[in-house]
Structure formats: C-alpha cells, structure tokens
C-alpha cells in the first residue's frame, strides 16, 4: 500500500518550538518557592520543550549552597512531573554584564560544574541538552572572561567528565566545536552515539538567520589548510559543516532580525541544511510574524502547499517520519510466518 503524508503537527519528542523560563538561585528563597515557580512556568508553557536558564550570579565567587542546590532539584523535579523535555543553560548574567558577574577564576566554574552535576544527572531522562559553558552574556559564550578556546575546551571537558553522557552538550559556533575537539572533520555515522565527547557535542545558535554571518557565528574569509581549528568559516562553509554534523547531534536556538536571510524560502533552505530541530517560540517576533503572514507554495502534490510559512517550519523542525509504503508477504501453505515490509522517510 502507498500512503500519503499528513500535514498535521506531530507530537514527536525533542523537537519543535520551545518556551524560555529563567530562575535565579538565591539563599533568600526556599526550595518550595522554586518548585511553585516551576509549576507555574510549566503550566503556562504549551510546548513539550523548555529552555530552562538557571542564573548562578549569587554564587560567582563562592560554592553553591545546599539550599540553592535543593532549589535546582525541586525545579527539575517539577519539569519531570510536567513531562517537559529540558534544554538547560547555566549562566551568571542576564544583563550583558558577564565580564563583571562571572567567577574570578576558572577553578570556581569547574567547582560549580561539579556541584550541579549530581542533581542534573539525577534527571538525565528529563534534561535533553546542556547548553554553553556557563559563561558569556546570557550564557551565550560571548563577551566573556573565558572566551579563549583553551579555556572553553577545559570547561567543556569538565562538563563531559561530570554530566551524564545521556545528555548532549552544546557550544555556540562550529568553530568552537572544531577547536574543542581539535579536528576539522565533523562527526560521522561510525562514531555517532558511541559515548565520546565528539558524539555528544552539539550546537546552539541565538543568531540564526540574523545576517549573512548569523550575528557572529560565521566569518567572511574562507578557511585555509593552515587556519586555526577554532577559526570561523564563511556562511556556505559552515552551513555544509552543520549539514554533516547535525545529522547526529541537535542544532537549534532562535531566529533574529528581520532581513532577507529569514525570508521564507531562504529560511526553509538554510534551516533544512542546518538540520535545525528546535527554535524559540517568542523571539524574534518580527521574524516569526513574517512567517505567519507568508504562504508556503510547494508542488501541486505537496500536502503543505498553501499553509503558512510558520506552520510549514513548525511541522518540519527536527525529524518527521513518514511511512511511504507497506506490504505483507504471507503464504499460508508454505509457512506460518508473515513478513512485513515498510518504507519510511524522514521529511523533517
């Protein structure tokens, strides 16, 4: 039998739009208050995916208190209860002041990673990705005291050693990923899922389609054989790198700044090449509204033709498995065994 694809939104886990919620750990709060906050946040979040930002600025130059760790535990417990899939980001800044709010030395960041790891690992079935290195403005690894590739590598390796291998890690740019792993070769099917740092290190991008450079993600100079491993390539080079890498690890973030690169046809082409699987549902509204007010026009037989650009992108984030054909081979005279043949395509 030949089947036709539906155009409806599928409730597949670990993909789609997400909603952001942020909480500041503080000894002025009790774990019960943090639990109540998270219950409210989860209840107001219509999406299975949640970007949970945990601000550690109150502990920049001290250990995280037991009370604060208990708050984190209660928050993640509520996420489990609400059946959320959590993209987790620890940070020290929400106000563009990371240079002054980050810890004064690298060992303190490593200490914080060690402290949070047991709680995070307890909820490894709920935490999908741990984004970033705790550093930079809004945890985006920029304008940081720890932006050197050797410092970034140390933090990621600390996360790799402490955080459950069931949880993906993520860095901001392909260049950073290459510099951390000391290789220009993207992850292959042979090494995918083998438990190594290379197999779990993914990307997040909070400047998706914001400019030709995705707001600092790419550069205008082609990579050379003698380029530093963490050097940024051109847009076309980095899109190809992501196309290869992100068949096996997640890639997502938020779109920003209304411009030609996020016009619908351009957006569909580049989001597809990047294998984008998750996007912020609230930012940038100018871009999201542009998609909502545009119409996708596919081929005459395309079931999505005529839907809004937003709906097309929403239904294609991440994977979308479609059964294309099925048949049964059964000969009762010859055997009691039947063979079922199914052809499945991923149209995401």
Say what each PLM segment does.
Residues 67-85, 102-131, 150-162:
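An active-site-proximal structural segment forming one wall of the substrate-binding cleft
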Residues 34-93, 106-109, 163, 167:
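Aromatic-lined substrate-binding rim segments of carbohydrate-active enzymes
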Residues 1-49, 53:
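Boundary/entry segment of secreted carbohydrate-active catalytic domains
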Residues 336-340:
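Structural beta-strand segments of beta-rich domains
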Residues 129-288:
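Catalytic-core regions of glycoside hydrolase
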Residues 345-348:
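Short solvent-exposed strand-capping/beta-turn motif centered on an Asx-Ser/Thr pair
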Residues 56-67, 96-107, 136-149:
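The substrate-binding groove and active-site-proximal loops of carbohydrate-active enzymes
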Residues 266-330:
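Catalytic cores of secreted or luminal carbohydrate-active enzymes
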